[in-house]
Design a protein with these regions (language model features):
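Functionally important transmembrane alpha-helices
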Residues: 127, 136, 144-195
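Membrane-interface helix/loop boundary segments of multi-pass membrane proteins
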Residues: 102-128, 157-164
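Structural signal for the C-terminal ends of transmembrane alpha-helices
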Residues: 30-39, 158-161
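Juxtamembrane helix-loop-helix connectors linking adjacent transmembrane helices
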Residues: 2-16, 35-100, 113, 117-118, ...
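Hydrophobic alpha-helical transmembrane segments
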Residues: 47-52, 89-93, 123-128, 145-146, ...
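Small-polar-interrupted transmembrane alpha-helices in polytopic inner-membrane proteins
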Residues: 57-61, 122-137
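Membrane-embedded alpha-helical segments of multi-pass membrane proteins
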Residues: 18-27, 86-90, 102, 106, ...
Length: 195
């Protein structure tokens, strides 16, 4: 499971979960510091862009995952095995935002900014960033690696063109929140997907 209880005591588990998620927030904050505070403020329009990007990646991504799993080309990803129901949803939402914050700030905003400053062209920079993103998702299976490369290409292209990172953070948050909380709400029953 991607998210498991770290302690039998609910309060200790909650503290450990928040501290672990805090590491991802710290990575993003460090990247922002190294960029000398180049961080655009969120705009209301970013919510719409984020929802659109989440749908473009999330809906086909779910179909791709279900097909790959059905054909035996990937492994089943269990988003949560948390055992404290009253903290499960807040912890999963915190992890969703931490993942989005850390990945989009570091792997898209920081990395693409630095590669551009080093004179990399758009194709090389997007390929490098996307393959990096895909590679650290391979523990979820080959289909997750490929899907994250595609996600990285789209999100990287969007950032390269607009310089806006908030739509990416929102989109990533929505994808993870739907996957994590949706799985928990369904009690792990994904038979309606044919898997």
């Amino acid at each position: 499971a991607l998210h498991q209880s770290l302690s039998n005591a609910p309060w200790i588990d909650l503290g450990l979960q928040l501290a672990s998620a805090g590491t991802l927030f710290a990575y993003g904050a460090l990247a922002l510091y190294l960029l000398a505070g180049q961080f655009p403020r969120p705009r209301w329009a970013d919510i719409g862009w984020g929802a659109g990007l989440a749908a473009i990646i999330g809906i086909p991504g779910l179909a791709f995952y279900a097909t790959a799993l059905h054909l035996g080309l990937t492994r089943e990803v269990v988003p949560t095995a948390l055992t404290h129901p009253w903290t499960e949803v807040p912890v999963l939402l915190t992890w969703s935002f931490a993942n989005a914050w850390g990945e989009e700030i570091v792997v898209v905003m920081y990395l693409l900014t630095r590669l551009r400053q080093l004179g990399w062209g758009v194709a090389g920079a997007l390929a490098f960033s996307s393959v990096l993103r895909g590679s650290y998702h391979l523990y979820q299976g080959v289909s997750a690696g490929v899907g994250n490369i595609i996600m990285g290409m789209l999100y990287g292209w969007f950032y390269w063109r607009t310089g806006r990172v908030w739509p990416l953070i929102i989109a990533h948050f929505l994808i993870d929140a739907v996957a994590f909380v949706g799985y928990a709400a369904l009690g792990g029953n994904l038979s309606w997907l044919g898997i």
